[in-house]
Amino acid sequence: MGDGPRGIVLTTAEIASEGLDVVLDAVARVGATALSTSLGVLVQGRPGDRTREPPLDVAGEARLLDRPLWGQRELYLKGYEPHEADPALWAGVAYPPPPIAPPEFRRDVPRQIIDGARARGLAAHIQVSPYTLPGAPGGQTTQSGHGGGVVADRPLRIDGTVAKRIVAGHGCLNNPRVRALGRARLAEAARWYGDVDGIFLDWAEYTCYFLEDAFACFCPHCRAAAEASGIDWTRIEADTRALWDRLHRLTPADLDRAIARGDWPFAMAGDLTDFPGYGELLRFKAASVRAALADLRATLDSAGGAGVALEANGFPPPWCHLTGMDYRHAGQIVAATRPKLFTFHWPMIARWWTETLLTWNPTLEPDATLRAVQACLDLPTPKSEHRRGLADYGMPRPDEAHPITMAALTRKLDQAVGLAGDSAPCQAYLHSYRPAEEFARVLAAAQSSTARGCWVQRYGYLSDEKLDILRAAWRGSNISQS
């Protein structure tokens, strides 16, 4: 791994639970050079009152925190904003600004984290989810929930449906209502925290947890944006529908071909060149992400944040090709990109994609279908894999190894770095929800990659044992604060 930041992501809830000095001293002690925090005022809630922590992610009940919040490894949190919204920033936005925290709750925790980081020589970053819809899950917003958000603002699939199962409830990036929401959120963050070193954007791309999500978005706003750019939308619709229909007519031979040569996510249906309009859709989604990032960069500049680095999280290869996260061209707009190696999601994705294909093709053999999906997504299983069938694939337990190989992790990082080329630095973004022994191996896999820096999500999953592992890995590394 090249020279770059060593960062830890945390939330204001962890500070409120353990104490500012306890958490920040622990971050500094492991050899971190940077931290990134959420901005909300997070307090204990009730079931049905905002969101579960850890996030449910549709079927993630097994996930628990390593570091309890107020004595609990799972709980419900209610979020508020630490500051009164500026009405001028929200003028013309279809969504109302989020409510400010009641006076009985501390509103200064985000500022304390930033100032405390600086006092310890750490670079201070914040994280913003510009396009996560209010009431929908996912993202770093105080308005997240377990609902679906405004359906009309969600990505529309080629079959005319909108997802009912949601991990990340973002709106369509070409929807003016959604873009206005993102600008208001980012401008509010810059208004109060314009002195930070950087702002990481989460979910400034499309999603693909479910196979069907790779066939979006076909809303009127996307059509208008495409046609304004001279793109043949009719061809995109026809070839995307052709690929969709082809995936409903799979044979065992198609699965065998994918297992032998899974060189893109839908290799079981043929080559991408067989569906040129779908390839055009992927290029259009990448252009949509770039336009959204450029819009946010301009927003930050006009809000007084010209000196603040804008950075972007994204899916790693091969998913990034479906989500629109074009690391090379995105890296010409943002100052850094972070491929997310959140590997607890990967068995869930493999299962969900497989279940969809089996629903569409009920005569296929489940194990062969799963192997084909794993091959297409470059998810080889380790020799020690204990899972024996589709039913075993889901959110891993806290002490359960993930069905991954370290070579695949390094390969995905190197592929993202290769895609980025000479644009902005590509930094590893690891998740610490996993057994401690595996965490050590994941760190080593990242350090053997060509990524330029490493971030760990999240303090709440870093047990004391994992903090010791992180300290051993990072204290001997070439460290910078960039």
Model-derived segments and spans:
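Substrate-binding cleft/loops of secretory-pathway carbohydrate-active enzymes
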Residues: 132-144, 208-210, 306-349, 434-451, ...
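Aromatic- and acid-rich polysaccharide-binding/catalytic face
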Residues: 202, 237, 241-278, 325-397, ...
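Active-site-adjacent "subsite" loops/lids of carbohydrate-active enzymes
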Residues: 6, 10-11, 80-115, 123-194, ...
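Aromatic-lined carbohydrate-binding/catalytic grooves of carbohydrate-active enzymes
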Residues: 32, 36-103
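Substrate-binding cleft of secreted/luminal carbohydrate-active enzymes
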Residues: 38-45, 334-352, 378-392, 396-477
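Aromatic- and acidic-residue-enriched segments that line the glycan-binding/catalytic groove
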Residues: 45-75, 132-165, 203-269, 331, ...
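Short, acidic/polar
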Residues: 14-28, 178-190, 318-331, 436-447
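Aromatic-lined carbohydrate-recognition surfaces of secreted/lumenal glycan-active proteins
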Residues: 9, 123-135, 200-204, 233-262, ...
